Swiss-Prot record:
Species of the source: Arabidopsis thaliana (Mouse-ear cress)
A GO molecular-function annotation: mRNA binding
PANTHER family, per the entry: RIBOSOMAL PROTEIN L7AE FAMILY MEMBER
Entries under InterPro entries matching the protein: eL8/uL1-like, H/ACA_rnp_Nhp2-like, Ribosomal_eL30-like_sf, Ribosomal_eL8/eL30/eS12/Gad45, Ribosomal_eL8/Nhp2
Similarity annotation: Belongs to the eukaryotic ribosomal protein eL8 family.
Protein task: Required for ribosome biogenesis. Part of a complex which catalyzes pseudouridylation of rRNA. This involves the isomerization of uridine such that the ribose is subsequently attached to C5, instead of the normal N1. Pseudouridine ('psi') residues may serve to stabilize the conformation of rRNAs.
GO cellular component: nucleolus; sno(s)RNA-containing ribonucleoprotein complex
Stated name of the protein: H/ACA ribonucleoprotein complex subunit 2-like protein
SUPFAM superfamilies reported for this sequence: L30e-like
Secretion signal, residue range per the UniProt entry: none
Length: 156
């Protein structure tokens, strides 16, 4: 019985860590449902090679005019690493959303290293997708993108 309560206490401590370490600029923050759908979209995009990982790649892609969906981790330290991303996304018309954990973001993006941000694109970096694969990815992308835009307007 004692180990059960200790396990429950450790889970509660982990939940508190997310709340404490979350950056103050992490708005709009995805809720649990949106977060789950976003991570599923990232997993599909990673499998199809339609994903840019890391701040440098994401910034480079946005500046070159590539459209997509930017997902930023909210527990980045130091925060200066990602403070320019929301402004860059707004200027380029790219929807963006924050998720609480960089570790979860990396896991969804099929990498072992924690990732600050990812950009989900509809076109792969190399090669082409079949029409069926593109249609599936596009429907998921549009659904998540619409939810993020709705969330962003409710925050502002």
């Amino acid at each position: 019985m004692g180990s059960d309560t200790e396990a429950e206490k450790s889970i509660q401590k982990e939940k508190k860590k997310y709340a404490i370490t979350l950056a103050p600029i992490a708005k709009p923050l995805a809720g649990k449902k949106l977060q789950k759908r976003t991570f599923k979209l990232i997993q599909k995009a990673a499998g199809k090679k339609c994903l840019k990982r890391g701040v440098k790649e994401v910034v480079k892609s946005i500046r070159r005019g590539q459209k997509g969906l930017c997902v930023i981790a909210g527990n980045i330290s130091p925060i200066d690493v990602i403070t320019h991303l929301p402004i860059l996304c707004e200027e380029a018309g790219v929807p963006y959303v924050y998720v609480p954990s960089k570790e979860d973001l990396a896991q969804a993006g099929a990498t072992k290293r924690p990732t600050c941000c990812v950009l989900v694109m509809l076109k792969p970096a190399k090669g082409d997708l079949t029409a069926e694969e593109l249609a599936k990815l596009k429907t998921d992308y549009e659904q998540v993108s619409d939810d993020i835009k709705e969330l962003a307007t409710s925050v502002i």
